[in-house]
Amino acid sequence: MDPQTALSRALLLLLFLHLSLLGCRSHPVGGPGPVSELPGLQELLDRLRDRVSELQAEQLRVEPLQQGQGLEETWDSPAAAPAGFLGPHHSILRALRGPKMMRDSGCFGRRLDRIGSLSGLGCNVLRRY
C-alpha cells in the first residue's frame, strides 16, 4: 500500500474515532428531545392564540364603525353623482377597475393555448412554484 494512501486512511480513521467519542449523534426534530423546551413552546402557543383572539375581537368592533363611516362618505363622493356628470370617461374607468382576467389572459389579447398553458413560455403565464 502506498504511504500517502495509508496516511490518509489513518487520518480519516482517527477523525472518525474522535467524532464518535464526542457523541456526534443526530437529533431528529420529531424525536424525543429536551423536555425543557416543551413548556416554553406551549406558553408561546397560548400567547399567540390569545393575541389572535384579541385581534379578531378588535376587528369585529372596528368593522361596523367603518361601514357606518362609509355610508356618510358615499353621499359626499363624486361616485354618487349622476352618470351623465362624469360623461364617457365613467365607463372607461369602470372597465379599468373591472376584473383583469380577460385583459391579461394572453399575449396581446390572444390566448396562446399550446405555448402558454402547457410549457409556460407564453405571455402573462402564472408560474406554479
Curated annotation (Swiss-Prot):
Disulfide linkages recorded for this protein, renumbered to the chain, are C107-C123
> What is the recorded name of this protein?
Natriuretic peptides B
Species of provenance: Bos taurus (Bovine)
One biological process term from GO is: cGMP biosynthetic process
PANTHER family, per this entry? ATRIAL NATRIURETIC FACTOR PRECURSOR, NATRIURETIC PEPTIDES B
Where does it live in the cell?
A: Secreted
Which keywords does UniProt give here?
A: Disulfide bond, Hormone, Secreted, Signal, Vasoactive
Q: Where does it mainly reside?
A: secreted
Q: How is it modified after translation?
A: The precursor molecule is proteolytically cleaved, possibly by FURIN or CORIN, to produce the active peptide. May undergo further proteolytic cleavage by various proteases such as DPP4, MME and possibly FAP, to give rise to a variety of shorter peptides. May be cleaved at Pro-99 by the prolyl endopeptidase FAP (seprase) activity (in vitro). May be degraded by IDE. During IDE degradation, the resulting products initially increase the activation of NPR1 and can also stimulate NPR2 to produce cGMP before the fragments are completely degraded and inactivated by IDE (in vitro).
